[in-house]
Amino acid sequence: MANTTGEPEEVSGALSPPSASAYVKLVLLGLIMCVSLAGNAILSLLVLKERALHKAPYYFLLDLCLADGIRSAVCFPFVLASVRHGSSWTFSALSCKIVAFMAVLFCFHAAFMLFCISVTRYMAIAHHRFYAKRMTLWTCAAVICMAWTLSVAMAFPPVFDVGTYKFIREEDQCIFEHRYFKANDTLGFMLMLAVLMAATHAVYGKLLLFEYRHRKMKPVQMVPAISQNWTFHGPGATGQAAANWIAGFGRGPMPPTLLGIRQNGHAASRRLLGMDEVKGEKQLGRMFYAITLLFLLLWSPYIVACYWRVFVKACAVPHRYLATAVWMSFAQAAVNPIVCFLLNKDLKKCLRTHAPCWGTGGAPAPREPYCVM
C-alpha cells in the first residue's frame, strides 16, 4: 500500500517515458500551480495596495493566500519531479521530511485559520460593536500567529517519527504514512483535522440561525401618552400640549418635561450601523463560507482514504480513487482567488481599477437608511 522500507525510493538508470496517466497528472498539477501562483499573487497585491481592503477579514484572506502560494511554489514542484521519474523520490530522506512537514503544516494552517475566520464572522454579525472595537490590526496578527503556532505543533511531531513522514508511491508525494491504527500514530492527526472542520461548520450553522432569527426588524411599538389634566406628557407625547400652552391657548400650569423625547447617554452613544455595512459583512461571510465548503469538499476524498487506511487492514484503497483524491487536495490551493473574485464586489472593483482594459466600475450605489444594531 505504502512504501514501508523507511527510505525514499531512488531512481537508477535512464528515465522511462511517462505513461498517459502521468501526462494527465503533470498537466493538471502544472495548471493548478499556475492558477494558484498567479491568483494568490494578484489577490495578495490587491489587499496590500488598496487601503480600502486594510480590514480584519482581508488580513486573514491575505494570510490564506500567502500560505497557498508558498505551498504551490515549494511542495508541488517535488510532486512534479516524482511523477516525471515514474512515481519515485530522487532526493534525500531529509528533504522528503521537510517537504512532508510543509505540506501538513499548510493543511492544518488552512483548517485552523478557517475556524478562526468563522468565529470572527459570527462576531461581526452577532456582536458588531464589540467586533469593530476589538478587531484591530494587532488582534488580527495575534490570531494569525496563533493559527501558525498550532499548525507547527500539529505538523512537527512526525519529524521525530511520531507518525512517520515518508514518500508514498501511490500519492507521488512525501506525506504521512497512514497504516493500520494499531501500528501507527496518525489517527490522532486525522481526528484533529476532522474536528476542526466540524467545528468550523458548526459556527457557520450558528451564524445562519442568528441571521434567520433576526431576518426582520422589530416593529415600532407606539407608547400612549399619559395625561391627568389634558397636558399629555410621557413617552408617547408629541409636544403639541406644550406648544398650545406657550401660544396662549392652554390653561393651568406649564406641562411637564417631555420625558419620551430625551434620550439617555447610553442610547445616544450607540453607533449607527448602515445597511450597506450589514450587507458587506454578510457578503464576506458568504465568501468565507464558500472557501470553507470548498476546502471540505476538496479534502474530504483524501481524508476518507486516510481513514480507510487506518481502519481497514484487509483491503487497499483503489489506485484511481487515491490519485483523484490527492489531486483534488492539490486543487484546493488554487480555488480561493477564484471564489474571492466571483463573490466579493470590493475585490472585483479593485481589480477593475488596476486593470483598465476591463473597464471602470459603475457609479457607487446610494447609501441606504441606517438601523441600530
Swiss-Prot record:
It is found in: Cell membrane. Expressed in the ovary, specifically in granulosa cells of follicles that have passed the primary stage and in oocytes (at protein level). Expressed at high levels in brain. Lower levels in small intestine. In brain regions, detected in all regions tested. Highest levels in the cerebellum and cerebral cortex. Disulfide bonds join C96-C174. It comes from the Eukaryota. Belongs to the G-protein coupled receptor 1 family. The chain crosses the membrane at residues 27-47, 60-80, 98-118, 140-160, 189-209, 288-308, 323-343. It comes from Homo sapiens (Human). Keywords: Cell membrane, Disulfide bond, G-protein coupled receptor, Glycoprotein, Membrane, Receptor, Transducer, Transmembrane, Transmembrane helix. Pfam families: 7tm_1. CDD domains: 7tmA_SREB3_GPR173 (cd15217). This is Probable G-protein coupled receptor 173. Residues 1-26, 81-97, 161-188, 309-322 are extracellular. One of its GO terms (molecular function) is gonadotropin-releasing hormone receptor activity. The gene is GPR173. Residues 48-59, 119-139, 210-287, 344-373 are cytoplasmic. InterPro entries: GPCR_Orphan/Phoenixin (IPR051509), GPCR_Rhodpsn (IPR000276), GPCR_Rhodpsn_7TM (IPR017452). GO terms for biological process: negative regulation of neuron migration; signal transduction. The keyword Disulfide bond applies. Its main location: membrane. The keyword Membrane applies. GO terms for cellular component: plasma membrane. Glycans are attached at N3, N184.
